[in-house]
Amino acid sequence: MENQLIFVRVATLNDIKYASEICRETESSAIARGTGIAKRPVEAVAQKMRDGKAVIAVTAAGIWVGFAYLQAWEQGKYVSNSGLIVSPAFRNSGVAKAIKDRIFKMSRRMYPDAKIFSITSGAAIMKMNTQLGFEPVTYHDITQDESFWEGCKGCVNYDVLSGKKKCNCLCTAMLFDPAKIAQQLLSPARSPYFPMFLSEAN
């Protein structure tokens, strides 16, 4: 849909009315694309809104556009950015990136020292993650909290994950490590192609 004003903001109690639609679209999108997206209970989505840990996009007319949420694990050591979904009518409009950027900034603000991760099989999300500073990692590099992996049981590919003892699956794990980013910023920049050398005055 073109020429509609879209608001991307933190979800509130008033947005719980969209929870059922979000869950339905998440499930139907997984079926249509044949990808592994875990089913999410309506109440779980509603609770994220109550907790102020979700981002929603809606039009000025109140039409739901998109959604994503965050969750802390291991006492805030890790934070997942999950559940990114956009209504089919608004895809390819840039709203997914706007939601992704907002949930990432929320995560950094609420948990500044946490490692932020995302697991996805979608190329578009991988690209957005890379632009934000995420890097591909092994599953051992993200949270080992069993509660997180329990959430994968609603995915059609859970048997693959279980069979590989949660070492890998069809999704790619990507991680943003603030400590690593800070270290890179402190390190002197060096060209990967040319050695360092000093020039002498003639």
Enumerate the predicted regions with their spans.
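A conserved beta-strand-loop-helix scaffold within acyl/acetyltransferase catalytic domains
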Residues: 24-27, 32-88
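Short amphipathic alpha-helix that is part of the acyltransferase structural core
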Residues: 1-42, 56-59, 183, 188, ...
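Terminal substrate-recognition subdomain of acyl/acetyltransferases
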Residues: 1-3, 108-113, 117-202
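Conserved acetyl-CoA-binding loop-helix of GNAT-fold acetyltransferases
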Residues: 86, 92-107, 116
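Hydrophobic adenine-recognition pocket in adenosine-nucleotide-binding enzymes
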Residues: 11, 84-86, 122
